[in-house]
Amino acid sequence: APEGGWDMIIYNLGATKALNFGDFNRINFEYLRNFTEALERNKLMPQKFLYMSSLSALGEADEKNYTPIDSTTVPHPNTRYGLSKIKSEMYLETHPEIHWIIFRPTGVYGPHEKDYLMMIECIDRHFDFGVGYRKQLLTFIYVDDLVGAMFDALASDKTLHRKYIISEPRAYTQTEFRAIVAKALGRKAVVPIKLPLWAAYVASYVAEKWSHISLKPSTLNRDKFKIMRQRNWNCSVAEAEADFGFHADYPLKRGIEETVKAYLAEKAAAKAQK
């Protein structure tokens, strides 16, 4: 808008790993509060404000019957990251003058995303590491589908002051994920290695302590362990489908093919530079 408030703002700033809760709180909550207060103070509040939260804000789900996470799930975040996200959500809920929409995406993947890249690299080396022995249901959303959902939600007149889970509307097992990635990489032999929970916890604890010494946040930490330990990430996107016609154009197979294509191109470019 040339004068007054913005038409729309997508607030995607956030930290997914940090040295401590203080950093998570500062980046994920305080920055949001400061930003919205500045908008209000300068009379620049947008007509719609889309906040990118996370499925982790809801915490652990039903791991007995594997009931999908949905809009009725009561949040009880079990990670520092999830706690900082639900705190931000609660802040928005208590400020109706902010015309908020909240997205709770599941694991976002795509070219150049770092966490899933580590899993792809392992499978490229013929190994697939998993945590725990009980069945685990995983959900994913390809980055292009998430971006499309943002603009569809902003264009809808039904989304104001609503929260939406964003995911491809089906879950996968670790075995299915491994098979899809291996096929995209052209790897016929991949050895699955299951780490017991205690071993994964020890590795996460050591990596986190080292990050405190090096002052560099580690991808592997106790927060990440709790996420890896969680067995049920299955979720419902019924509200998003009903309110703004959400659909995923990239099922995991297609999204992984695009992600692997970018990974192999970067790998070839790095090899050519040596």
Predicted regions and their residues:
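NAD(P)H-binding glycine-rich loop region in Rossmannoid oxidoreductase-like domains
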Residues: 1-34, 40-41, 58-60
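Active-site YXXXK catalytic motif of short-chain dehydrogenase/reductase
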Residues: 28, 70, 81-85
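Conserved Rossmann-fold NAD(P)-dependent oxidoreductase catalytic core, especially the SDR/UDP-sugar
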Residues: 34-80, 101
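Flexible, glycine-rich beta-alpha linker
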Residues: 58, 101-118
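Active-site Tyr-X1-5-Lys
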Residues: 76-104
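Substrate-positioning beta->alpha
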Residues: 83, 87, 113-118, 132-155, ...
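Conserved C-terminal active-site "lid" loop/helix of NAD(P)H-dependent oxidoreductases
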Residues: 143, 179, 203-247
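Mid/C-terminal beta-alpha module of Rossmann-like enzyme folds, strongest
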Residues: 156-219, 253, 257-258, 267-274
